[in-house]
Amino acid sequence: MRIGLIGSGQMGNRVEEVAQERGDTILLLQTASKEATTLVFPELPELLIDFSHPDNLEKILSYSLSYQLPLVIGTTGYTQSQFQEIKEHAKHVPVMYSANFSFGIMVMNQLIKQAAAMLQGWQIELIEKHHSRKKDAPSGTANMLLQTIQEVQKLQPVYNWQGKKREENQIGVHSIRAGSLPGEHDVLFAATDEIFTIKHESFSNRIFAAGAVEAADWLKDQSPGYYKLEDLLMDKGV
């Protein structure tokens, strides 16, 4: 594949590393300034992978549409209106968005959905831990897991409990930022005298890069549409 890579941070570097190990060609963005009105690559990519910033969305969508390039998005922090733009864009080209490209997290997400449906009345807590340099809290993955739970149970999130007792129909959401923790997500279901926990730990952001590259390889053969990582897993029979 000829991958147009947008984003030169940790995740962008990991994607470049993983793709080159596979024998793919990475085309690095040649205009990275905020003032640039379009994207420029050394040659035309076959598809785009974005791990950059929400501010870049307009020019990314414009470039993708102009050349009909499939688009894999791993950037988090979009507004609801930006998500609507992405979904509208997906009517014309295949798009996959995921806050987390770990296949383990996707399986965890499905397990949480089942548990939330089966354990009605249990109290639920969501705890996520990341390194001290992470800029957003809760993480995009935590928000994804929360949304999955809320699709099953109408719970109101309370962020980092403080100074009041728990009420019905609430879910606690907690963020920890310390050291070099690569990423951990725990969803705890609690009832009287028992606790059930679903947990995922990542030890390197390489898993997210590998998932994004595999997603791109799958997405390039799909019709226009808005895809999630679960679609790839289902296609593989996972």
Q: Can you say where each PLM-predicted feature lies in the sequence?
A:
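Short acidic/histidine-rich motifs immediately flanking catalytic phosphotransfer sites
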Residues: 41-49, 66-71
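Aromatic/hydrophobic pocket-lining residues that form π-stacking "cages" and hydrophobic walls in ligand
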Residues: 15, 60, 86, 111, ...
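Rossmann-fold NAD(P)-binding glycine/threonine-rich loop
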Residues: 55, 62, 75-95, 106, ...
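Residues at the C-terminal ends
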Residues: 21, 65-66
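Rossmann-fold dehydrogenase core element
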Residues: 70, 85-102, 116-124
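Short, acidic/turn-prone active-site loops that include or flank metal/cofactor-
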Residues: 32-36, 76-79, 100-101
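C-terminal substrate-binding/catalytic lobe of Rossmann-fold NAD(P)-dependent oxidoreductases
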Residues: 2, 6, 10-42, 120-238
